[in-house]
Amino acid sequence: MNLTLKIWRQKDAKSKGKMEMLDVLNEELVNKGEEPVVFDHDCREGICGACSLQINGEPHGPDRLITTCQLHMRMFKDGDTIFIEPFRAKAFPVVKDLMVDRSAFDRIQHAGGYVSVNTSGN
């Protein structure tokens, strides 16, 4: 399957962001000896929300009730272009590339807030 990924790049919270194709971007980064695309992750089990991504303009992607780490590439068609961007909201400012400042979410958790999620699929 051939897919084109367009990844959001942003140096810091004050810089203007831009979209770039992952294959071209990665080739340029490797050739220049620069760091890879920055993104946040935590559990990789679909319960933490650390990914904080939008896929094709949809939070976590086009499937309902799943997170980005649960999104299977097989749902896309050969030749699709996939836009991968960070959540861009006042409460979650972009730190760099695909990583956002989740301290607002962390404050809710520290105050005792939680979300119950069934991860077994039943």
Where are these regions (language model features)?
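Signature of N-terminal electron-transfer/Fe-S-associated modules in redox systems
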Residues: 1-122
